[in-house]
């Protein structure tokens, strides 16, 4: 455990098969992109430490298969999570339509009601868009989620998605526990009104 790490957070990435969950994870953790990346079998897991507004957090990021046959993994997968990234493909409307199913699953299996959710519309680098940005934003607002559009291929919005999610988690009292409570760690906050950090207008904090 690093002495300067404020906390360790469990982050989940969920969504239909083929929406780019693993690609987003690899872009964020390893800064790589593989257009031929195979579908996840079961659960993948990566760890990355980031600093948000002066607060360093270690992220344990779980990437799960979107296929129905792997749903038996669900209960243990959701247990203890503080943040969820729900991904759809902006070029496949069916993945957007099925977001409600994923939210229902989240409500069923999540062990707490103050979990922070981020909606990500992936693959904005492609031209054959079927889901408008405003549709994603409207859905996110309806369900009190953070929202961003991104591209794992070009890296647009990827870093921002994780940073905004972590920032919101840290700002939520009781959602996480400090691993340095006896070391006098002081939680720092971004100045009020400073706005979207490095998002460049991508993120909407709702």
From Swiss-Prot:
One of its GO terms (molecular function) is GDP binding. The keyword Nucleotide-binding applies. A lipid is attached at residue 199 (S-palmitoyl cysteine). The small GTPases Rab are key regulators of intracellular membrane trafficking, from the formation of transport vesicles to their fusion with membranes. Rabs cycle between an inactive GDP-bound form and an active GTP-bound form that is able to recruit to membranes different sets of downstream effectors directly responsible for vesicle formation, movement, tethering and fusion. RAB18 is required for the localization of ZFYVE1 to lipid droplets and for its function in mediating the formation of endoplasmic reticulum-lipid droplets (ER-LD) contacts. The modification Phosphoserine is found at residue 144. A lipid is attached at residue 203 (S-geranylgeranyl cysteine). GTP binds at residues 17, 20-23, 34-35, 40, 66, 123, 125, 152. Belongs to the small GTPase superfamily. Rab family. This is Ras-related protein Rab-18. It is found in: Endoplasmic reticulum membrane; Golgi apparatus, cis-Golgi network membrane; Lipid droplet; Apical cell membrane. A motif (Switch 2) lies at residues 63-80. Regulated by guanine nucleotide exchange factors (GEFs) which promote the exchange of bound GDP for free GTP. Regulated by GTPase activating proteins (GAPs) which increase the GTP hydrolysis activity at the ER membrane. Inhibited by GDP dissociation inhibitors (GDIs) which prevent Rab-GDP dissociation. The modification Cysteine methyl ester is found at residue 203. Mg(2+) binds at residues 22, 40. GO terms for cellular component: apical plasma membrane; cis-Golgi network membrane; endoplasmic reticulum membrane; lipid droplet. The keyword Transport applies. Residues 204-206 form a propeptide. Its EC number is 3.6.5.2. Gene3D superfamilies: P-loop containing nucleotide triphosphate hydrolases.
């Amino acid at each position: 455990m690093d002495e300067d790490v404020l906390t360790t957070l469990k982050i989940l990435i969920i969504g239909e098969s083929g929406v780019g969950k693993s690609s987003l994870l690899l872009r964020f953790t390893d800064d790589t992109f593989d257009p031929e990346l195979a579908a996840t079998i079961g659960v993948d897991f990566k760890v990355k430490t980031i600093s948000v507004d002066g607060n360093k957090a270690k992220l344990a990021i779980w990437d799960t298969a979107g296929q129905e046959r792997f749903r038996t993994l669900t209960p243990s997968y959701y247990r203890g999570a503080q943040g969820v990234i729900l991904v759809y493909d902006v070029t496949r409307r069916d993945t957007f339509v099925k977001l409600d199913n994923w939210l229902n699953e989240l409500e069923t299996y999540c062990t707490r009601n103050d979990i922070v959710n981020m909606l990500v519309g992936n693959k904005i680098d492609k031209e054959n868009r079927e889901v408008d940005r405003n549709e994603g934003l409207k859905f996110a607002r309806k369900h009190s989620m953070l929202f961003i559009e991104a591209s794992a291929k070009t890296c647009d919005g990827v870093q921002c998605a994780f940073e905004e999610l972590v920032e919101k988690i840290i700002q939520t009292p009781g959602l996480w526990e400090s691993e340095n409570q006896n070391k006098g760690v002081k939680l720092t906050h971004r100045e009020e009104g400073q706005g979207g950090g490095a998002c460049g207008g991508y993120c909407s904090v709702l």
